[in-house]
Amino acid sequence: MNNRILIIAHAPLASALRDCAMHVYAECSADVIALDVLPNAQPEDTLAQALDAAGASLDSGLLVLTDIFGATPANVAQKLVAGSNAKLIAGVNLPMLFRSVCYRHETLEALAARAQAGGAQGIMPVGCTAPQNQSGPRHAPSYHDHQQ
């Protein structure tokens, strides 16, 4: 049985991340759940929605991914996983989610480790070497002067 993945994030990030994952991994739609937290949402209401979304997975294999540690979605997620077997990781990004989807069949501990590594490895500096970014001959400033 696969672990399930619940994304709790500021709207519309959770749904957007899930949509991206479904674009690539459509077969896992039942295992990935998104909960968008609206700006005016009350934490108690969001927690109730999260409990409903998590269902029985809370004790049978749930990885919760949230966006910003200390923000409302993460605080709700912390309350959700407290006293359960679920794992929680803050700082969700697309590489983390893709890694989670690919390894959702592993143990929850292994899945959480892979998710965290995937998120961190997905962040890297990228050099700009495309031709349009290289220095080349410039036009004389007068080239752009036009009579009005």
What are these regions (language model features)?
Residues 1-65, 69-148:
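N-terminal loops that bind phosphate or other acidic moieties
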